[in-house]
């Protein structure tokens, strides 16, 4: 189990993600982003790549998909907030989205 992010960790690790469009969730220690893809196949392929890593990490996103849009929220339930696992998964998600041809 990774500990909850410290204030210093937040400054260091969340800034690059917020620059890429990740938002802090109001009223909750979590981050959220919506991705838009060319079509459903691209969105589903992206979700599959993310799911494979999430399963290896035993850290699963909250997500919602309609056609070419995927909304993702990350938080670590075991520490009731953000942890390094969320940072690692969000960073991978960014790379996977680029590879899946976001629109």
UniProtKB/Swiss-Prot annotation:
In terms of InterPro entries, this protein maps to: PCD_sf, Pterin_deHydtase
| A GO MF term | 4-alpha-hydroxytetrahydrobiopterin dehydratase activity
For this protein, the Enzyme Commission number is 4.2.1.96
Q: Pfam families under this entry? A: Pterin_4a
Q: Which family does it belong to?
A: Belongs to the pterin-4-alpha-carbinolamine dehydratase family.
Q: Which SUPFAM superfamilies match?
A: PCD-like (SSF55248)
Protein encoded by which gene? Pcd
Q: Which CDD domains match?
A: PCD_DCoH_subfamily_b
Keywords noted in UniProt: Lyase, Tetrahydrobiopterin biosynthesis
According to the lineage, what is the superkingdom? Eukaryota
Q: What biological processes does GO assign it?
A: tetrahydrobiopterin biosynthetic process
Biological role stated in the UniProt entry: Involved in tetrahydrobiopterin biosynthesis.
Q: What protein am I looking at?
A: Probable pterin-4-alpha-carbinolamine dehydratase
Reactions it catalyzes: (4aS,6R)-4a-hydroxy-L-erythro-5,6,7,8-tetrahydrobiopterin = (6R)-L-erythro-6,7-dihydrobiopterin + H2O
Quote the Gene3D superfamilies the UniProt record gives.
Transcriptional coactivator/pterin dehydratase
């Amino acid at each position: 189990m990774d500990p909850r992010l410290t204030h210093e960790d937040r400054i260091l690790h969340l800034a690059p993600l917020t620059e890429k469009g990740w938002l802090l969730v109001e009223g909750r220690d979590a981050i959220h982003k919506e991705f838009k893809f060319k079509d459903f196949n691209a969105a589903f392929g992206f979700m599959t790549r993310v799911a494979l890593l999430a399963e290896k990490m035993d850290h699963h996103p909250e997500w919602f998909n309609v056609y070419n849009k995927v909304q993702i929220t990350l938080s670590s339930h075991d520490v009731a907030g953000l942890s390094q696992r969320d940072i690692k998964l969000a960073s991978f998600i960014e790379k996977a989205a680029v590879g899946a041809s976001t629109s």
